[in-house]
């Protein structure tokens, strides 16, 4: 009995030691590879830089960047990506070039979805209403990066008011939302209260391990695998040909 107890204690000691080592590795990697700079979702950082006006609504959150100098025709709406920013850098660069810009958040702000899951595409109507109320005229251009580009493509096929789109690292498909999966997977976006058809994510084992260890991860393999195994790719495809 004592011998069995000693064996069990040794096993427990080994498990505890391994857990401590793993926790140390994760903490080290998290500190080493953490993103530099301010929290991209911290809207106070944008406000403190000045030269912007806060824009709020039921879901609408962001800032208006009035053009520097003589304003060019139209307005540009910009979105960030999965980091949750309003693409402040792009908005200010365009502002400097004489464009009126709306830099909007689409999740992560008070009154919005906390994570990039089930973001209502309907919120863009608030942006259109804001522009109309403030007498903005001319072409409407919408710009997005990565998941923001996926958002922009989905908006473009649903809102005829959009004249032009600019998308960086876009997707031809709507993918699964990014967030807490304990309640199950869901789409990144909804439309009129219903989830937009999406491609479920299938993460390779190597990517899963690197994520657990807080190591830098490339998600290209994840998205390629997810698309290859998608049960209905066509349903999830963004019908961008409908954008005229």
Language-model segment annotations:
Residues 1-20:
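N-terminal Sec-pathway targeting helices
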Residues 26-71, 230-236:
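N-terminal cap/lid segment of alpha/beta-hydrolase-fold proteins
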Residues 72-81:
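Short beta-strand element of the alpha/beta-hydrolase
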Residues 96-111:
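Conserved alpha/beta-hydrolase
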Residues 108-137:
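Catalytic nucleophile-loop/oxyanion-hole region of alpha/beta-hydrolase
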Residues 135-146:
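Alpha/beta-hydrolase fold nucleophile elbow
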Residues 149-160, 165:
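Short glycine-enriched nucleophile-adjacent loop
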Residues 166-243:
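Accessory cap/linker subdomain of secreted extracellular hydrolases
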């Amino acid at each position: 009995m004592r011998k069995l107890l000693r064996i069990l204690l040794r096993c427990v000691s080994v498990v505890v030691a391994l857990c401590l080592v793993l926790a140390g590795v994760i903490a080290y990697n998290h500190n080493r590879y953490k993103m530099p700079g301010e929290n991209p979702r911290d809207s106070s950082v944008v406000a403190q830089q000045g030269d912007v006006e806060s824009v709020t609504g039921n879901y609408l959150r962001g800032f208006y960047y009035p053009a520097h100098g003589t304003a060019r025709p139209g307005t540009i709406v910009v979105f960030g990506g999965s980091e949750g920013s309003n693409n402040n850098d792009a908005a200010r660069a365009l502002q400097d070039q004489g464009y009126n810009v709306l830099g909007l958040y689409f999740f992560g702000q008070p009154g919005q979805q906390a994570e990039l899951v089930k973001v209502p595409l309907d919120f863009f109507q608030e942006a259109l209403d804001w522009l109309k109320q403030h007498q903005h005229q001319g072409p409407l251009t919408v710009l997005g990066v990565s998941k923001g580009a996926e958002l922009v493509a989905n908006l473009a096929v649903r809102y005829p008011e959009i004249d032009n789109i600019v998308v960086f690292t876009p997707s031809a498909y709507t993918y699964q939302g990014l967030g807490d999966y304990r309640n199950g997977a869901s789409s990144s976006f909804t439309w009129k209260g219903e989830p937009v058809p999406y491609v479920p994510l299938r993460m390779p084992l190597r990517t899963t391990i690197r994520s657990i260890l807080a190591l830098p991860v490339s998600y290209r393999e994840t998205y390629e695998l997810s698309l290859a195994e998608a049960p209905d790719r066509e349903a999830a495809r963004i019908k961008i040909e409908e954008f005229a």
